[in-house]
Amino acid sequence: MATPTSVRIAGFRSLQALCAQRTVTRNFSLLNRPAPNYPGHIPLTPVERGVLAIGSAVGSLLNPRRGDLIATLGETTATPFFIYRLRDAMLSNPTGRRILRDRPRITSQTLSLPYLRSLPPNTVGYTYAAWLDREGVSPDTRSSVQYIDDEECAYVMQRYRECHDFYHAVTGLPIMVEGEIALKAFEFLNTLIPMTGLSVFAAVRLKPEERQRFWSIHLPWAVRSGLASKELINVYWEEQLERDVNELREELNIEKPPDLRDIRKKLREQKRAARRQQ
């Protein structure tokens, strides 16, 4: 029986064949650019894609809070193979195929946050809304995909992007840089999107105690859960809102990591207590 890990490894083995089939020769320049494949699409030459990838990688390393650069890095490094692998993972799953057919979007217009807040505290919907409120964020902050040529694959990237906050909610990881790096490490093992793996290098920007905590607590957690968990891109989150969140975690093989905000709060209290005793 295939495991989540073996399925993802099998995808790597088909890299050469997939790239040969799907990489399109793009004979255009700045003065001869083809028409976009979907609203908002910006076709890129290989040189442009490479420059954007390098620039966004350096920029996001210097400032991990630049969501626009992280989004650009995600798009420019996902082709020609990785976004197709993720799309194929959806095509091989009944729920994934339904998501591709329905093309749902996750915004404050498609989800009723007041309703989610009214659900029992143990539900997925309440957990998601409570996480948004706790972190002070909105589902409307995800930028639209621009640099992926294939229209269906562009939706796959958009879906991943809009589901990201659900990953935060079910793991409990906050949006601070330390929490984002931990979640990106988990996402890399689950999705194989290069940007998520490259984001781990931002750990060099953490304070020494944060970096030590990442290596000793959250990276081992990310490896365990990322390899064991099912493909999260195939979760129809809109249909899970009234489910028990712990049951869903168990079904997806997601281990909840230690609460990062609680860890940081206790450390601050310990430091204050130590200063008072001096």
UniProtKB/Swiss-Prot annotation:
UniProt record similarity statement: Belongs to the COQ4 family.
**Quaternary organization:** Component of a multi-subunit COQ enzyme complex, composed of at least COQ3, COQ4, COQ5, COQ6, COQ7 and COQ9.
Which protein, by its recorded name, is this? Answer: Ubiquinone biosynthesis protein COQ4, mitochondrial
Q: In which pathway does it act?
A: Cofactor biosynthesis; ubiquinone biosynthesis
Transit peptide residues according to the UniProt entry: 1-28
- Which species does this protein come from? Uncinocarpus reesii (strain UAMH 1704)
Role? Lyase that catalyzes the C1-decarboxylation of 4-hydroxy-3-methoxy-5-(all-trans-polyprenyl)benzoic acid into 2-methoxy-6-(all-trans-polyprenyl)phenol during ubiquinone biosynthesis.
Annotated GO biological processes are: ubiquinone biosynthetic process
Binding-site list for Zn(2+): H164, D165, H168, E180
Where does the source fall among the domains of life?
Eukaryota
The gene coding this protein = COQ4
Q: What is its EC number?
A: 4.1.1.130
Q: Where in the cell is it found?
A: Mitochondrion inner membrane
User: Entry's InterPro entries?
Assistant: Coq4, Coq4_euk
| Short name of one Pfam family | Coq4
